[in-house]
Amino acid sequence: MRVGIQGWGSEGDLRPLVALAARLRRSGHSASLVVTPVDGKDYRPLCDALGISLTTVPDRVEITVQQIAQEAKSANPTKLITKVLALTFDPYVEPMYDAARDLCARSDVVVAGPSCWTLKAASLATRTPHAIIDYVPGVVPSRLIPPDFLPPWRWLARPGWALLSVLMDMAFAATPRRFFAAKGLPRIRHVIPDVVFSDHLNLHAASPSFWPPAPDWAETHCVCGELAMPDDAEPWALSSALRSFLNEGPPPVLLSLGSWEHIVQDRGLDLLLASARASGLRAIVQTKRSDVEVRQGETFILPWAPHRRLAPMCCAVVHHGGAGTTHMALRAGKPALVLPFILEQRMWAKRLARCGAGRWLSFWKATPERVGALMREVVSSVALRERAERMASSMVNEDGAGVAVRRLEVLAAASTASPDSKPRPTTSMGERRS
């Protein structure tokens, strides 16, 4: 099976696609990856080590993360993400679409990362079976369950999804509508489902133990599990300084804002460091703004480390609510404090609080005093810790990448057996399984 994968975004958006490509390779399939990194990260060394064919489109995004941070300063989550799209996605739609058509020409199945609707457009133009990777199951409409930003009352489901559809259309529909119309492709009615979902297969890269599917979802939606990087993909060992720090006292709290630190360069690192001091707890602060390890009393500043390796050595995690970091903390059995920037991160934060494994506070309302107090609460709570440990136990045997590969194999086989047939499309309000 030849699989073409296209992704746009930051490290949190693209690493799972690399992980999927790696699993496809290890399963005996061919995987070609096209990426548009908005944070300037070079994926060539990692992909070379994993034997993955990689193309970066364009060769270099003509705006730096520093410029993005200067331009995208809004504390309004919708305005923030639309500004990032205007700076880093919209200018490259045509070359991304050309690359997507090339992927379709040499693939049996194509897979698009979140927001990467250029590949859906190309798949429609070339009639190539198409799947989408999504990191937020909470945006799949249901007649029974409302969107995660609302209370879980069934009567809110229909008006809640109607409201979310309107908000998504207002924020994100204009560019794909113009593009699809210009290419003579089917009309975009609504962002959900026409832009963000596939009629063939949608792989929601989340733990089914943590975020189970609604009972009325269509079979085209699969909560497959986290797409985790192979443990041997990125060799890492504790430095002597970090080992000494860990051995000198109780387990620290791990703090990281991931790639979102780029957006708030003036504030992000300062908030984490000040919050660590205000908490009175030992802490490891991971940052992209330092190239060297630095110790400041009971706080250790770390440039990079694989979260999955580091988190088990800590007592709790403070993060921004990305899908990957949320799973990292849960798999390690550690309670978390989430500081979300945008809606999808807030959905993860609320889901975590609802399951009893963490607390959350909007990043835009965070102060060192409030974050420090919540850190102490999370670390001292036996109930939060025990719930996080139970979640870790329930997730231990989940194999998201393996499930995703098997679903893609089924999609490819169905296409080969009946190349002119089209799978039943997903309805906007959640089609029942047959």
Where are these regions (language model features)?
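Conserved nucleotide-sugar phosphate-binding/catalytic loop shared by glycosyltransferases and other
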Residues: 37-81
